Regions:
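Alpha-helical transmembrane segments and immediately membrane-proximal extracytoplasmic
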Residues: 1-258
C-alpha cells in the first residue's frame, strides 16, 4: 500500500515539475512574440502619426491607396486563417473547450501581420487580445513539439495566453488572474503552476527589453479623502451597469443584423 502511494506521489511531483519547466519555456516564447508585437505597434503608431501630420494633398491620395491595399491584405489573411479575426480571447476559449481547432502557423502569421496593418490604417486595435491569442497559439505549437498529453496541452495553452497578456502590459499577476477567471474558469494547482511560471518568465523578458515601467504609468500627487469612497463605490456600480448594457447591446446587434 505504501509503495503504491509513493508511486502516485512520485508521478504527481514529476507532473508538477514538467508543467513548471514547460511553463517557463512557453512563457519565454509567448513573451518574445508579445514584446515584438508591442514594439511593432508602437513604431507603426508613431510612423503613422508623423506621416499624417506632414502629408501633402497627393501624399494623402497615396495614403488612401495604401489603406485600400492594407484592407485587401487583411481580407486575404482572414480567408487564409479565419480564426485570426476578432479579439482572440473567445477563440482561445473555444480552443480549450474543443469547439475549434486553430491552425497554429496561419493563425500566428495572420494575427501578427493583420494587427500591424490594422494599426497602420488607424483602426482601434489593442494589444491585449492579439497577445493572448499569439501566446496561446505558440503554446499549442510547443505542446505538440514536446509531445505532451491532452490535459497538459490545455494547461500550457492557458499558460501561454496568460503569459502573452503579462508581457503585453508588464503585469504577471493580471495575466494569471485573467487566465483563471476568463479562460480556464477553474482553480487547480496543476493549472496555476505552469501559468505562474509562464507569466513570470514572460514578464522577466518584457522587463529586460522594455524596462520595468508599467504599461499605464502615472504619478499619485494627492491622497484620496475618505469621504470620496462612497463616490468610488457608486462609480463602480455605474460602470458595471454600463458594461452589462454594452455587452448585451453587442449580443443583440449580432443576433439582429444579418
Amino acid at each position: 500500500m505504501t509503495e503504491i502511494h509513493d508511486k502516485k506521489l512520485y508521478r504527481k511531483k514529476r507532473l508538477e515539475w514538467r508543467l513548471a519547466l514547460f511553463g517557463l519555456l512557453v512563457g519565454l516564447a509567448s513573451g518574445i512574440i508579445a514584446v515584438c508585437y508591442r514594439l511593432f505597434l508602437t513604431k507603426v503608431d508613431s510612423l503613422r502619426t508623423s506621416v499624417l501630420l506632414s502629408a501633402t494633398f497627393w501624399q494623402s491620395v497615396g495614403i488612401l491607396l495604401a489603406l485600400l491595399f492594407f484592407a485587401f491584405c487583411m481580407h486575404r489573411l482572414l480567408l487564409w486563417a479565419p480564426y485570426s479575426g476578432g479579439s482572440g480571447i473567445p477563440q482561445i476559449r473555444a480552443e480549450l473547450l474543443g469547439k475549434i481547432d486553430m491552425a497554429v502557423e496561419p493563425t500566428i502569421v495572420s494575427k501578427f501581420i493583420g494587427g500591424i496593418l490594422g494599426n497602420a490604417g488607424g483602426l482601434t486595435l489593442g494589444r491585449e487580445g492579439p497577445s493572448i491569442q499569439l501566446g496561446g497559439m505558440l503554446a499549442k505549437k510547443a505542446s505538440r513539439l514536446l509531445d505532451v498529453s491532452e490535459m497538459e496541452e490545455r494547461y500550457l495553452v492557458t499558460a501561454g495566453a496568460a503569459a502573452g497578456l503579462a508581457a503585453a502590459f508588464n503585469a504577471p499577476l493580471s495575466g494569471a488572474l485573467f487566465a483563471m477567471e476568463e479562460i480556464h474558469k477553474s482553480l487547480s494547482h496543476l493549472f496555476l503552476i505552469p501559468c505562474l511560471a509562464a507569466c513570470l518568465m514572460a514578464n522577466y523578458f518584457s522587463f529586460s527589453v522594455l524596462g520595468v515601467q508599467s504599461a499605464f504609468a502615472f504619478g499619485i500627487h494627492a491622497t484620496l479623502p475618505v469621504t470620496a469612497l462612497g463616490f468610488i463605490v457608486a462609480m463602480g456600480v455605474l460602470s458595471g451597469l454600463v458594461g452589462v448594457v454594452f455587452n448585451r447591446g453587442l449580443l443583440f446587434a449580432n443576433r439582429a443584423l444579418p
